[in-house]
Each structure stands twice: as C-alpha cells, then as structure tokens.
C-alpha cells in the first residue's frame, strides 16, 4: 500500500522535494511553493486520513513511516529533501529520526519535536481525544470554527479563519479523528536527541508571529529561519518568503 500523491517531474540529477501537509490539509497545500522549483522533481503526498489517502488508516507513527517509505520506493525516489508543515513536519521528523540512506535534508515548518514530560503527554492525549470525538460527531464547520480559535492560530484574522474553515470542512471527520489520535503528540517520542545525531542538514522555518513554535525552535539543533509577516502556517501567510527561504537552503 502507498499514499496517494501528485508528481511534478523536474530535470535529471536533481534530488526530489517531498512535501507533507498539515492536519486537515492535502497534497495541494504546498503546491504554490513547489511550483517555484520547476527544476526539482516534486512529490506532493496525501497523509493517511486525508485527501486521496482518506481511506488509509494507521495505528501509529511506525505505520506512517512504513507507508512513506513504500511510497518513496514505488516512485524510485532515492535522493530527496523531506519538507513538512505542522503534522507533516512531525511525520517528517519521525521518519528522519531513523537512518534513511537517500535523505539529503529535512525542512520543517512549525512542527513539534515532542513533549518532554508525562504530565504534558497526558494533557495532550485528553485534549486530542476530545477533539477526535468532536470530529466524529459534529458538523465540521462548527468543529473547525472552534479549532482555529486555538492560541497557536491567534495571528489569523476573521477572513483568514473563515477561509480555512471552509477549506478544511471538505474533509471526512471520521478519518481525520483516526489520524489525529494515531499521530497524537502524546504518542510521539521526543525526537530532539535523535535529530541532533543526524548526518544531513536540518532547517526549521517559523512564522515570526508564532510565539509558541519560535520558543520550541530554540530547543532544536537546527538552522532556524524566521518568516516575516507570518503566523503558524507560514507558507500560507507568506509564500514568497518561504519560497525565498527554500531557494536559499537548496542552493547551499
């Protein structure tokens, strides 16, 4: 089994850019950024429970890792940069925390490397379970209206919230709930030590208005890139700045 994906071919010799979206997003989330790199072959994935992979279920991060590796193998992708936002960033960090022969670099935007104490894990597990129950039972428009009131999205204005609620409400609530719990931050290892031992470049992008993840970034052994005029979803808020940042990273 492999993940649903869209492919844009590039020029021979360039490593692939493999894009992973955030929770409730899909393969199109990174397209505007990826289109700025026509020389590089690009793979845009739908994570389990999302988009064309909505019917694919996993139990944990190990299941996601297996699917991701199988998908890369199926496209004969042997040299690649892994680029992920939020949930996609956590998937990318989990995947990269184990030896991966073909990985040329890791780029994460607003992804959490893992909780560091049992109390925080329990609180997160309870929180994610409550959200999952709402995704299963309530109209998605109402759930997402509340979802985007969370502190991490504080930089959004009313119009931005309304647009995101409309976009995300196209999802399947039951499959979102399953993925939310399977990849809960409560079930994720603290990846800081394993990522520090990596043998590839690790770049971390963060919106300047995203105070929570700016603080988290300081705990990582990664090159930090602040994206101006952006909150948690930097590539949506300021795609031009993210494109410029990626161009600089990929040219180095």
Swiss-Prot record:
Its EC number is 4.2.99.20. Disulfide bonds: none annotated. The keyword Lipid biosynthesis does not apply. GO terms for molecular function: 2-succinyl-6-hydroxy-2,4-cyclohexadiene-1-carboxylate synthase activity. The keyword Lyase applies. One of its GO terms (biological process) is menaquinone biosynthetic process. Signal peptide: none annotated. It catalyses: 5-enolpyruvoyl-6-hydroxy-2-succinyl-cyclohex-3-ene-1-carboxylate = (1R,6R)-6-hydroxy-2-succinyl-cyclohexa-2,4-diene-1-carboxylate + pyruvate. Monomer. Catalyzes a proton abstraction reaction that results in 2,5-elimination of pyruvate from 2-succinyl-5-enolpyruvyl-6-hydroxy-3-cyclohexene-1-carboxylate (SEPHCHC) and the formation of 2-succinyl-6-hydroxy-2,4-cyclohexadiene-1-carboxylate (SHCHC). PANTHER family: 2-SUCCINYL-5-ENOLPYRUVYL-6-HYDROXY-3-CYCLOHEXENE-1-CARBOXYLATE SYNTHASE (PTHR42916), PROTEIN PHYLLO, CHLOROPLASTIC (PTHR42916:SF1). This is 2-succinyl-6-hydroxy-2,4-cyclohexadiene-1-carboxylate synthase.
